[in-house]
């Protein structure tokens, strides 16, 4: 177990795999071969938990043996308002998350996965070739941006306003349940796939991309 001060944001740099769970207390636990555990650093600055390999080295540079297995970092905190993954690391939240405002950023080739989110507002962005799966999101306001070749997937509930932007060759897939207004824009060869039901919908497109609304019902 690593000792850290309180935090409400998690920043993953490099290639670690982080498993997050909302809980009553703050904790950081690193599991794996000792040679790998020794190379992981976790420290808090300005309420941000930073997780990565020492001196920002990658696992390839460190020459871990094949039988060292997988390294996992388990993190808990009472609240989570921000997640940032830079590189090829993964951030996985397999349990429900309940917060006020949430910002999620993925830069690189990593993955971000949530089971379900309840919040007032969410802003999520993918830059690069990574994949973001937000699960079921109950929120009043949502903003989704994909730049590059990455993918974003979300199921929205009771959302009043949603803005979706794809620039490049990436994809955004959003399902709506009992939602208000949504605006979707594509610039490039990317795709936006919308389904479910909305009260109002608008879109704009520049390039060879596509906005698929075959399974979208506008009331």
Region spans (language model):
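Acidic (Asp/Glu) and glycine-rich low-complexity loops/linkers
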Residues: 1-86, 90-106, 116-125, 136-142, ...
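Short, surface-exposed interaction patches in beta-rich subdomains
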Residues: 132-219
């Amino acid at each position: 177990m690593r000792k850290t001060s309180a935090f409400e944001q998690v920043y993953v740099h490099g290639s670690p795999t982080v498993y997050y769970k909302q809980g009553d207390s703050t904790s950081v636990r690193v599991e794996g071969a000792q040679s790998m555990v020794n190379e992981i650093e976790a420290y808090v600055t300005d309420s941000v938990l930073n997780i990565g390999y020492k001196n920002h080295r990658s696992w390839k540079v460190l020459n871990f043996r094949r039988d060292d297995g997988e390294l996992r970092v388990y993190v808990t905190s009472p609240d989570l308002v921000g997640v940032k993954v830079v590189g090829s690391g993964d951030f996985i939240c397999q349990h429900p998350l309940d917060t006020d405002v949430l910002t999620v950023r993925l830069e690189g080739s990593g993955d971000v996965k949530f089971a379900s989110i309840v919040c007032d507002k969410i802003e999520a962005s993918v830059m690069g070739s990574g994949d973001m799966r937000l699960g079921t999101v109950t929120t009043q306001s949502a903003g989704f941006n994909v730049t590059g070749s990455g993918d974003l997937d979300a199921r929205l509930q009771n959302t009043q306003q949603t803005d979706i932007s794809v620039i490049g060759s990436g994809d955004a897939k959003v399902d709506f349940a009992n939602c208000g207004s949504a605006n979707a824009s594509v610039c490039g060869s990317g795709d936006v796939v919308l389904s479910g039901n909305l009260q109002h919908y608008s879109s704009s497109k520049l390039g060879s991309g596509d906005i698929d609304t075959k399974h979208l019902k506008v009331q």
